[in-house]
Amino acid sequence: MYGYQGTGGQQPLGAQPTGFGFGNTPVQQQQQPMQPMQQSQPTGYQAPGGFQNYQPTGFAQQQQQQQPQQTGFQSMQPPMQQTGFQSQPNVSMYQGGGGQGYQSAPMLHQQTMQTGYQPQQQQPGFTGFQPQQQQQQQQTGFTGFQQQPQQQQPGFTGFQSQPTGYNANASAPAATPAAPLQQQKTGNARDPFAPTLPARPPLTSQPTGGGNKSVVDGVYIPNVRLSFLTADDQRNFENLFRQALPKGEQALSGDKARDILFRSGLPPITLSAIWNLADTTRSGALLFPEFAVAMYLCGQAVKGQTVPNNLSENIKNEVSSMVDIISFNIPDAGSRPSSSGQSVPQSQPQQQQQQSSASMLAGLNLGQPTGYQQQQATGYQPMQQQSTGYPMQAMQPQITGGMPLQQQRTGPMQPLQQQSTGYAPLQSQLTGGAPLQSQLTGGAPLQSQLTGGAPLQSQLTGGAPLQQQSTGYAPLQQQSTGYAPLQQQSTGYMPQQQTGMQPQSTGYGSMQPLTAMPTGKPGQWGFINTPSQGLPGIETMQQRLMPQATGAPVQQLPPMQLQQSATVNWAIAKEEKQIYDGIFMAWDKKRAGAIDGDTAIKIFTQSGLNRADLEAIWTLSDPSNKGRLDRDEFAVAMHLIYRHLNGYPIPSRLPPELVPPSSKNFSDSVNQVKSYLKAGGGRTGGSKLKSRSFTGDSTIKKDATVFKNDDSDFGYTSRNRRGGSSSTASSNGSSGNDISLSGKGSSISELKKLIREKQILLDAIDAEDSDMSRDSNLERRDQEAVADLKRRIQNVQRDIDVAPHSAISTDVGASADAKRNLMRKLDHLGDRLPQLASNVRRIEDKIANAKMELFRLKNPTSLVGTGPGGAITEADRIKARSKAKLQARMAALTGKGTTTGADASEEEDYEHRLLTHTSEVERSKAQNYEMIHDIEDSVKSLQRDLSSKLRETQEEVSEDRQRRRWEEAVGVEDDVRQFIYSLRSTRSSRPAPATASSSAPATGSPATAAPISATSTGASTPSAPAAGVDRKAQLKAEAERKMNERLAALGIKRKEKAQAHGFAPPDAKPAEASPAASPAVASPAVASPAATPAVSSPAPVSRGVPAPAAATPATDPATTPAVPVSAPADDSDSDDEEYEKLMAQKREQEERFKKQQEADKKKEEEKKQKKAAKEERMRKLREEMEANEAREKAWKESQSKEAEADEAEGDVGAAALAAFSNKATAPSTTPTAVAATPPVATSTPSPAAPTVPAADDNNPFHRLNNGGDAAAAAPAAGGEDNNPFLRPGTNQPIAAPSPASFSEAPKEAPKPVDPVKISNQRANQRAAKNDDDDWGMSSDEDDDQDYHRGNAAELASQLFRTMAPPIQRQPTGGAPITATPTGSAPAAPPAAPPVAPAAVEVAVAASEATPGPESAPPAPPMPEINIPPATEAPSAPAATEAPPAPPSAPTTIETTHLPPPVDTHNDMSSSEFDFETPEGSPTQQTFAEAAPPVAAPPPPPPTAAAAAPTGIPPPPPSAPGFGAPEAPSGIPPPPPPAPGFGAPPPPPGPAPSFDAPGGAPPPPPPGPPPPMFGAPAPPSMTGPSAGDLPERPPAATGGITALLGEITGGKTLRRVDDKDKKISSNPSAGAVLN
């Protein structure tokens, strides 16, 4: 075979493809005339040496052409490989060299064969060349040889004749065959040279002809139509699949499929379900049918359809069949590397060649010229094999081939002729490799061939083996027809060619299944074919792991011994599974079906892996943690070991391919059984023991719940069975029949036997009858017991129905449906809370913005801000300063009073007021926010409480289950169910008076309520109605109560809303409940004695419930008759005990409810008190509003009397001087009185103390300040209350001087006051503010005189407003009667001492003494003074008569921060939140003193220490005597008398202090800093000692005289601007830094 194919066979084999594909007849015609040329070929071949020298160059060209042509050759290679060249794939190269041997003689072929495939290497240099490629391209391939010789012809003309002869069929010398040769050349134009250009298109077409290559490397999609897709959809999906698929892959990876599926826009959960359905192979990748299913499901999901849980059977079958088709047609990944890249695509051409060779053998025999082409075809196939080995040994064969070519040169001429004529030698080489070797040794035969043509005959004779080789080549016989040697060669050719060709075809057929066999796709566990490269090292591992017969320990494998570069798939191959099963069976000697851990350790440790790896492998193999491995799990473990030994890592989780089918099926079965059990486990209500019955019915009801096999029931038995008739008759018939049936006269022994049997049967029947009678007796007894039990139950039910509290027992708690409804409503309301809170916050923001806008509108100023949002810029300030300077100069020129200081401070005033108002608004908004947050928290906590009460507990669930069982007959026997229904019917048919009588006491009469409580529970009954009748209303009322409490704590009232909804306040519940409720709540101790005979359970006492105060004895007699109504005493059954337990539980509930009612009552009382306090505040607010209106009217009247007011100023100045002189002596006496009073003061608070809490109980200030005057007095006693600028919580209530000092003060200044003058003076002082009523700007007025006059009057009021009025402040100071000014006194209505008007005048007169407005900026507006109507201030009543203190404080709060005379918005806001400004702040006091009511008779200014505005922080703690008799911080409660109390107070800050005429000492404390306050510090009645007082500026001598002169003249006074009046509202006003 080798020799034949290698040398001479090249051309014949090459001719075979030609004959197959292109026709043999023309070639035969060419060959016959060319036979002579073959003889001449040796001469041409004599130059092969040169030809060889030339061939390398031609070979390089041919190589270049071969490389692209190799693809075409691949299709032709397999036949050669299968014919025997598979073992020697390079034979093709040798065959190429066959051309050389062909030329040189058989011996040359022997030489080439000797090289052993060195000729393979050599021939590529010569014929390894393109002949392969050219022949492949032509599949005539012939001209490859022709063309190469043609290339060689230029070098050797004789050699040219050889090629043409070699072309054999296209020789150039023969003119007649030249045309066919040209045709062959054109066919062979596929080869390298110019003539091959027209043939290149076949080259490209042939690679495509190798269509199998596109199937392997491309995408293989069967032409199968999927029924669930339309044709367009399937085509579109196929195109999309091909585009997304990487080259060389058949399945779309998970990542790429995910990217495509994500384009659908479906959620990941839906895509996950679609992936689980589409990935039928569980490989993590999608073949085309799976991809089509995924796209189909995505389309359905996009349309809105739901993704099914499972695919339909139709889709499953179509997809699985298509997946199988793809799997069978895709070559196994392991088999690809086994063959060269050219081997696979040659499959189809090989088949074609084989088929053609098989079908045309006869034709080949007829036409040897075609056989000549066959020789070319065989040359074809070797050349193809050369191309296979070509990349590896292309150049080397050329180099080594030079040697044989030289040998051919030695005797080339005749051997070439003999070779050309005698193809038989070439055939003889094909017969086997051994002859080739012998040829190699024999160089002498080569010489004999060279001697002459005789050797040709010898070749023929020696060609007997060659004839055997050439038996397969029938065409050679045709060629040899003209030549006897050729005929012999051809005859010998036939059989060998046939034998050679047959294995080729069959061998190639065997390779096809190898390519298609890898049907095992991922997931097919244990059914994967063995990879083509085998399982390296598996036998070694098997030998190592098998148990040793000797029992000696086996040496462990080295860890890396089995590691190779082998490909080991995840799935277990069949052969591998068999090996693992063998190892398993060898170790499982007990045939237990499993290997325990110890045995597994012995096996696995022999693999050489470390312990950690083996642990991981065991964990993966034993997922259920059984501690042993069955056969499949053992195979998994071994496969993992094998993979790891081959270099693969151990996975973290078992891939789907390795999950054993047994475990899958078992887990599925277990899950299915569990689902069955779960589905049937929840069914209750029917008893499965149907033999139990109270009726005695012996018939057993058949149903599907219970099945019991009856062994005696055999079903149908055929009568035709032998032996069965007699036994059946004997058992069913009579004895006579038995005898007759026994047949033919039974013997006596048989009759005796029958008698004994019948006797036994009779005895059994008797025993059965006795048992039945015994059973009937037992059943009858049970029936009687059941009947008795029924009667007892009926009696108990009757007693329950008759009992007044039957509603409680029948309706214990709300039903589950009602609870669920309440829970839903509660959740719904809770969900609305955030939205409501958000709306309230938004409204709060709007309110704050509106307040700021209102402030800007009501407080116009010359200092207009030009910045964003009306902000004042530096340019605005500069302009205001320049304007103020200009006014000062004008005043100096005109001789008017200077207003430079006030104008200069105008911008600071406005900014301070704006800042104050802004902070106030922000604080108010923050407070509201906090209140809203508190409400939210309270509602949430209330919701949690209610939900916890409504939520069912485990006990309630169990109780409800028992209740439903015994009341609704759920889950009981049929008889019991009927009995329960009968009880229910009797209960409903019984008249209702009993229930009415039971419900009546629950709601009303005390005569029945008490007996019921004593009889049933021994406790009070008020909870009965709430527990059983209307629990829903109770829960609602409780929720309302809690909400009202929390809102009341925040100062919000919701009582009207609650009443509007029909819910009575919690405190009204005890009154509305039965009259017996209150006595029972008051004293369960009295009610319990009557209950003790029936139920001896002191549950209420033991649970720690406090015994109520008293019980109504009238109800006790009524309780005794009801005792017998309770459970009968003679019943000692468990029912009584259960009943007692229920009643005890009821008593506990009632006790808890009583406690709750008591707490609710207390809270309601507190709420009422708070409500009263709030109403009082509202009343005061209304009064203040009326007072403001009165003042406004008085001011309007006073405008018409401005001239008279100017004249009155002189009188006021005189009055001020008189008051000033009186004041000089008054302080000297007042301190002595104060000093004398401390001992009395210490005793007087004790009797007044009891009345203080009652008076202050409704005061929200006391509640916010931890309630009561004690808390208010504590800071004062500690010396910390003297700072009015601290937080309101620390010093809110301000202590007032003792009544003794107040009584003395009016006596010292009994000077009468003209009310008209005072009114006019006040009107002038308030001119600036009252002008605001017309929404004008006082600064815009041109009347400078009025401006100065108002300003001077305001300045005087600020300087001297606190000279005498501090005495009048005591009644509302809220402090007890004590000499200590820091103590708190009970509130009293404001008194009107006669000194107050004079003091006011003095203050006005003293205001003229201020050197200038710069040292004393204007005070806050006067109309904002908290002044009650004149009717409320006739005199100061006793401390015990004092009404609540707060009314005075809120009034000041409302009015002080309102620019207009009446500001209802601020009044209301401050009334709601009036707990932030301390009562004794100097701001309030100065306001209160500076503006007494105008419309009232001449009462003095209010004496109450008014609270500061809500949002305005108090001034700094530097003025201890600002109208409130507080000592400065750090002074003990009874401070020593100030030595200089006889003198009027000096002006504050830089303003010079005034010495009283007569050298009176200076007043105690100075006022706030001048930039903030223009008013001097008011004198404190109990001022500190001189050492404790802050320093004062030096007094200016003569200041009083100058000031009084100005006041008398009235020319330098000017109207005070509204900004100046409110200067004290600034949070930094009056701050004194210690």
UniProtKB/Swiss-Prot annotation:
CDD domains (alphabetical): EH
Compositionally biased residues, Gly residues: 1-11
PANTHER family: ACTIN CYTOSKELETON-REGULATORY COMPLEX PROTEIN PAN1, EH DOMAIN
Single GO MF annotation: actin binding
Disordered: region residues: 1-215, 330-471, 492-522, 711-744, 946-965, 985-1634
Name listed for the protein in its UniProt record: Actin cytoskeleton-regulatory complex protein PAN1
Subunit structure: Component of the PAN1 actin cytoskeleton-regulatory complex.
Cellular component terms per the entry's GO annotation: actin cortical patch; cytoplasm; endosome membrane; plasma membrane
